[in-house]
């Protein structure tokens, strides 16, 4: 299990979002679940149950308290997890997609571009060029 003080040292999430996640026990429980199961299917229902709420109520609560949706949190943390693989390892993008919980390379690439503004292969090339 992750130390809760370490859960949200994220380079992609804004500092105020990280503070809000840590401040509310329900959002922290859900966010910890995401971090601990990043390579697996993440279900809103499971996060809501950990927070002691229904899915609908939790979804509203999370967005209201944190300032982003739960699905945005999941996508952002998955992409952040992928960054270290792209920066440190060679390997197929399809394998990386599976390791970060995406069912297809296409879905992963779309999410990556949405968060990072470039494709995973473009990001990797840029990192190699900067070395």
Language-model-detected regions and their locations in the chain:
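Basic/polar phosphate-binding segments, predominantly the helix-turn-helix DNA-binding elements
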Residues: 4-18, 33-35, 40-77, 91, ...
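Intrinsic structural disorder/low-complexity segments
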Residues: 16, 29, 127-129
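Short, basic, alpha-helical segments at the C-terminal edge of helix-turn-helix-like DNA-binding modules
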Residues: 74-84, 122-131
